[in-house]
Regions:
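Catalytic binding pocket for nucleotide-activated donors in carbohydrate/polymer assembly enzymes
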Residues: 220-223, 245, 368-444
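Donor nucleotide-activated moiety binding/catalytic core segment of transferases
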Residues: 170-171, 317-371, 376
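C-terminal alpha-helical cap of glycosyltransferases
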Residues: 448-468
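Short acidic-hydrophobic, aromatic-tinged amphipathic segments that line or gate anion-handling sites
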Residues: 67-71, 336-338, 342-344, 409-421
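Active-site and donor-binding regions of nucleotide-sugar-utilizing enzymes
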Residues: 16-261, 318-319, 370
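Conserved catalytic-core segment of nucleotide-activated headgroup transferases in glycan assembly
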Residues: 31-37, 256-342
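A short, charged/proline- and glycine-enriched loop
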Residues: 10-17, 173-174, 270-277
Length: 468
């Protein structure tokens, strides 16, 4: 597909906003929520810029131009400085340390803890082959870890003298603000921050996830402002990234505005309905299907087949598991996803919300979805179990991931470190007469704050004195 040309805009006193979408997952936050249109309606001139793979997925908007940037590769300077930052800051985040290790290690244990001797030897050889392959693929990490090599690399980058800039189409548009939804500093984000500063364009990096500041990457050059999920993210930005706290705005996440707009009163449950337990899967390799079956088998034996429904909602993008286990209990109701090509994630529609709101207890590893369950006052249990197959089980990750520790440190949230312990906590919550729970997670995300859209628009208006 050819790049489409940027239309000539008539002279206007409206502030110009350029929104750069570099990932299809941002479609949920910026288009499906109506956020792009709301900014335009608030008195701004908005143009969306997207690379080819995202552009073809975007809906048409009658009054907002969408520009195809084609395919843009990041500069070598951006690639290396972002990676070097991960190494230099690794002492400030346990996730950074883990991420560096996992560039070489497989998700499964190299020497399996069960199976026949010959099977374990074959699995070990396969894992060692993967370690060697990972070492070749990530050989530059060795350079980043050795101080003299880092000095040579910095010298090389200075001699290379690569220009870091914004795409020409954005430069020609001459925006007052460049807003970049982001899941990390990788890709063209860092180049665009540098280029925008040179062009005296104010920048906002809108962080679109929970774990970016503690686990994704470092920003070698910081934007003028970040927007983040909550107050705890402000603290991470200050401690890990040396940000000025006043430049980190805890507006929330655009796709989470739904949790600020719905009523949070506890719904009175119809006692005639079956009780429902929902297990939410995790992307990392974890023997969760065995756990789901164990939960289903226990409650079927304890209460009979017709008293409690067990639902399993797998992660839409799960890593490959090494246990080879599949659900055997035919009573388990498994969520089937429709086409995920547009955003790689399920739509946050009524069906999605009902899955959470109709559950009596929600169980899962400490993920964003479990935070969402707590935002709608569902009773929750965190799965912190380990298994014999994977080094990435939720129980082990609770000690490795900085952002996960923010959740597991909250003592009021029930946890299960073993399958029996998990079942015990679930059963206790089912027998509890209350129909909801109020966990102290306002520091992670506060549902009482104004919606992200309102806060962002107010912020832009306050800093745009030449509005019509």
């Amino acid at each position: 597909m050819q790049k489409n040309k940027l239309n000539e805009h008539t002279l206007t006193t409206k502030p110009r906003i350029a929104i750069l979408l570099g990932n299809r997952q941002f479609i949920r936050s910026w288009f499906d929520t109506g956020l792009v249109q709301k900014i335009e309606n608030a008195g701004f001139l908005v143009t969306v810029f997207a690379q080819q793979d995202v552009f073809v997925l975007l809906p048409k908007l009658s009054n907002i131009q969408i520009v195809n940037l084609g395919t843009i590769e990041p500069t070598k300077k951006s690639v290396h400085t972002v990676a070097l930052g991960l190494v230099s800051k690794r002492s400030l985040s346990t996730t950074f340390k883990w991420k560096l290790k996992m560039q070489f290690l497989p998700p499964q244990w190299i020497f399996p803890q069960n199976g026949s001797f010959s099977l374990r030897v074959r699995a070990a050889l396969k894992s060692l082959k993967r370690v060697l392959g990972n070492a070749l693929d990530n050989k530059m990490t060795f350079v980043y870890l050795v101080k003299p090599c880092r000095s040579i690399l910095h010298l090389y980058l200075r001699l290379l003298n690569e220009a870091q800039d914004i795409p020409l189409e954005i430069k020609q548009y001459s925006p007052d603000w460049l807003i970049m939804p982001s899941s990390s500093a990788q890709g063209i984000v860092t180049d665009c921050i540098v280029g925008a500063k040179s062009a005296r364009i104010q920048t906002i990096v809108a962080i679109d996830n929970w774990d970016q500041l503690t686990g994704k990457s470092i920003y070698p050059t910081k934007p003028d402002y970040f927007t983040v999920m909550g107050q705890r993210c402000v603290e991470h930005a200050t401690y890990i990234h040396d940000c000025d706290p006043s430049s980190v705005l805890p507006f929330g996440l655009p796709r989470f505005d739904i949790y600020r707009n719905i009523q949070h009163s506890c719904i009175v449950r119809n006692p005639a309905n079956k009780k429902k337990v929902l297990y939410c899967g995790v992307t990392m390799a974890h023997s969760e299907k065995f756990i789901v079956d164990s939960i289903a088998d226990f409650f079927k034996e304890k209460y009979g087949p017709d008293e409690i429904e067990i639902h399993y909602r797998p992660h839409p993008g799960p890593s490959q598991r090494s246990d080879g286990y599949e659900i055997k209990n035919n009573d388990v109701r498994i969520t089937k996803y429709s086409n995920l090509e547009r955003t790689a994630m399920p739509d946050m529609n009524k069906e999605f919300l009902d899955a959470l709101l109709t559950a009596d207890v929600i169980v899962g590893a400490p993920t964003t979805l479990m935070v969402e369950a707590m935002l709608v006052n569902r009773k929750c249990v965190l799965d912190l179990t380990i298994d014999k197959f994977h080094r990435t089980t939720s129980g082990l990750m609770a000690n490795k991931f900085t952002h996960v520790q923010d959740l597991t440190a909250i003592q009021q949230i029930p946890q299960g470190a073993t399958i029996n312990g998990l079942i015990f906590e679930i059963n206790k919550l089912l027998e509890d007469g209350s129909n909801c729970a109020h966990y102290p997670i306002d520091h992670l995300y506060n549902t009482r704050d104004r919606p992200y859209a309102d806060q962002l628009i107010s912020f832009l208006q306050a800093r745009s004195s030449y509005l019509e």
